[in-house]
């Protein structure tokens, strides 16, 4: 389970501070798909970058399972990003020469962890789209 509690992020421009995320709260169950939607400049990418700890945030907590992500060293964060978090961005990004199923499995292929469980999950995801 992913929990985001009271997340705040702002950016500085000159003498001004711009609050982009103000008290964001959300929870996402294991294997749940969530769409983050909004107009350009609304903070969608900032939220995802905070969740993955690519950028710092001023206030709040992000917990995955029983681990708070803020404060993990880069090695531990890389492991979390590779094994526990996944993002699909709005740009169409399939790899030419691979089937859709193989594209779904790309992260597992890179990790060298294509197993029966990963293949079943890929098939399940494909069945959602017919």
Question: What are the residue ranges of the model-derived segments?
Answer:
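The feature captures the beta-strand-to-loop junction immediately N-terminal to the Walker
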Residues: 37-39
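A short, flexible loop at the N-terminus of ABC-type nucleotide-binding domains that lies
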Residues: 1, 10-23, 73
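Short coil-to-helix segment of the ABC ATPase nucleotide-binding domain corresponding to the Q-loop/switch region
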Residues: 97-107
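Conserved ABC ATPase "signature" region
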Residues: 67-68, 105, 116-130
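Conserved beta-strand
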Residues: 4-7, 19-29, 60
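Helix-to-loop junction immediately C-terminal to a conserved catalytic motif
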Residues: 52
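ABC ATPase NBD coupling module
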Residues: 69-86
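Conserved ABC transporter NBD signature motif
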Residues: 60-71
């Amino acid at each position: 389970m992913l929990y985001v509690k009271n997340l705040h992020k702002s950016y500085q421009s000159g003498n001004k501070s711009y609050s982009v995320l103000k008290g964001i709260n959300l929870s996402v169950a294991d294997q749940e798909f969530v769409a983050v939607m909004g107009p350009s400049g609304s903070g969608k990418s900032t939220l995802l970058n905070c969740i993955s700890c690519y950028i710092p945030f001023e206030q709040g907590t992000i917990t995955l399972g029983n681990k708070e992500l803020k404060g993990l060293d880069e090695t531990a964060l890389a492991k979390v990003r590779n094994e526990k978090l996944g993002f699909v961005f709005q740009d169409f990004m399939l790899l030419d020469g691979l089937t859709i199923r193989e594209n779904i499995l790309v992260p597992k292929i890179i990790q060298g962890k294509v197993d029966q469980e990963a293949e079943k999950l890929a098939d399940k995801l494909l069945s959602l789209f017919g």
